[in-house]
UniProtKB/Swiss-Prot annotation:
Domain S4 RNA-binding: 85-148
Lineage: superkingdom: Eukaryota
BP-aspect Gene Ontology terms: enzyme-directed rRNA pseudouridine synthesis
SUPFAM superfamilies hit by this protein: Pseudouridine synthase
Chain segments carrying region Disordered: 1-42
Higher taxonomy: Eukaryota, Metazoa, Ecdysozoa, Nematoda, Chromadorea
PROSITE patterns: PSI_RLU (PS01129), S4 (PS50889)
Annotated GO MF terms: pseudouridine synthase activity; RNA binding
Comp. bias regions, Basic and acidic residues: 18-30
Sequence similarity: Belongs to the pseudouridine synthase RluA family.
Originating organism: Caenorhabditis elegans
Full protein name: Uncharacterized protein K07E8.7
Residue numbers annotated as active site: 199
Length: 432
């Protein structure tokens, strides 16, 4: 299931410069009686974990955990690329899993607040420093029902083995279904500080600091290159016997989707690959990374002509006849950006279109008749279980494919001269 949506033309990454389910929720969340929280202190960052409902019903089907939908507040601040643009146009392009008319209608209904005040002006132009809240019906994506295994815990550190399928922290349609969300809801753990990140479908060693001093120390040593980071991945093809070093710079392809590519004006990146074994079709490879760019191993393995097996994003013909080997895409940067964007639109995951819903949304967006906005005092328990403008409530989604949950990429070991944390080799990496 792709956590992506359409991006307007002026939202695309700049060209390289040439420089180097609908079911009743029987239990109300513990905070369901709370009214909308404003940004009382403009400088205080609101921890989304603190606002998570603690008792959202869920069910497990075929080893997959499905969470019931619930109401939640999305908070953000104006990004540089948003300044001077209409708020509803920005959100239509960047909000995930929504109908193209949703932002305009939500604004009319009074579900969006700017700087603590209800904003119903669909022509509002975003300014630097704007603080935005959006109350919406959240349908979290399903995850595998797997435990988060504790590797080590001290007064300063909490180290776990992250299972595949869930992000580390709140993002997009994930909140409770994140590592931090599950640790809070299931174990009551709070105050953990993320020391590094792993992609949603990646598994392996994940470190948290339990206090500010440890957080600062670890991030300082990380910047100084004192960490040794070892990964294991399974790639397509027979990988060369000799060590392969990739130092291609990496930068964004489609910003709002987080999709990266090799580009001359990207950030420096360095990865070392060494084959462990091959079955003649695929290879298991050990990787040491000296930098930590977004999707670095996935992008570098693609560049080497051996993309990670089953990678829905980077192991695809949309990148060209050789799937992006040597960054030879056989198309312009704009064409690549557009093709990749269209491949991962949320609409591609709908079971079938809902013409009635589409027509209703078109009508509500175009209708100039004033709408009485929702009362700012509206509580969560007063909100409906079915939302008439929520796309997930109105459009059936396809079954999530297995390769969405797991990427054949595992963080095996993180260490410095002072400490070392390691997991067992994943089953798929063990030679039979």
């Amino acid at each position: 299931m792709s956590d992506t949506t359409d991006v307007p033309e002026n939202q695309k990454s700049p060209k390289p410069s040439g420089k180097a389910d609908k079911r009743k929720i029987e239990e109300k969340p513990e905070n369901s009686s709370l009214k909308r929280k404003k940004f009382e202190d403009p400088n205080k960052k609101v921890d989304p974990l603190e606002e998570l409902p603690m008792k959202v019903p869920f069910k497990i089907v075929d080893g997959v955990r499905h969470l019931a939908p619930y109401w939640a507040c999305y908070r953000t601040r104006t990004k540089g690329r948003w300044i001077g643009r209409k708020m509803v146009e920005v959100f239509s392009g960047e909000f995930l899993s929504t109908n193209r008319n949703y932002a305009k209608i939500a604004c009319k209904m009074g579900r969006i607040y700017v700087n603590g005040e209800q904003m119903t002006d669909v022509d509002y132009v975003m300014r630097n420093g704007d603080r935005v809240e959006h109350w919406a019906h959240r349908h979290e994506h399903p995850i595998r029902d797997l435990p988060i295994r504790v590797i080590s815990e001290t007064d300063d550190l909490f180290v776990v083995e992250k299972p595949p399928s869930l992000p580390v922290h709140t993002c997009g349609q994930y909140a409770i279904h994140t590592v931090l969300g599950q640790l809070r809801v299931n174990e009551g753990r709070t105050g953990l500080r993320v020391l590094h990140r792993l992609d949603r479908a990646t598994s392996g060693v994940l470190l948290f600091a339990k206090n500010y001093e440890t957080d600062l120390e670890f991030k300082t040593t990380l910047k100084q290159g004192e960490w040794s980071k070892e990964y294991i991945c399974k790639v397509d093809g027979v990988f060369p016997d000799e060590e392969q070093v990739c130092e291609q710079p990496i930068g964004p392809l489609v910003i709002s989707m987080g999709i990266q590519c090799v580009r001359p004006d990207g950030k420096d990146a360095k990865s070392r690959f060494r084959k462990l074994w091959s079955d003649g079709t695929q290879s298991v490879v050990q990787v040491h990374i000296e930098t930590g760019r977004t999707h670095q191993i996935r992008v570098h393995s693609q560049f080497l002509g051996h993309p990670i097996a089953g990678d829905q994003i980077y192991n695809s013909a949309v990148w060209g006849p050789t799937k992006g080997k040597n960054a030879d895409y056989q198309k312009s940067f704009d064409e690549l950006c557009e093709d990749v964007r269209n491949t991962h639109k949320c609409e591609n995951w709908h079971e079938k279109p809902n013409p009635e819903f589409e027509q209703r949304m078109e009508h509500l967006a175009a209708d100039t008749t004033p709408i009485t906005p929702e009362a700012p005092s509206l509580t969560l328990e007063q909100r409906p279980e079915f939302d008439e403008i929520c796309q997930k409530c109105n459009v059936e989604s396809k079954k999530v494919p297995e390769n969405h949950f797991q990427l054949y990429l595992h963080c095996l070991k993180y260490e410095t001269k002072k400490w070392s944390f390691k997991t067992e080799m994943p089953d798929w990496a063990v030679q039979k």
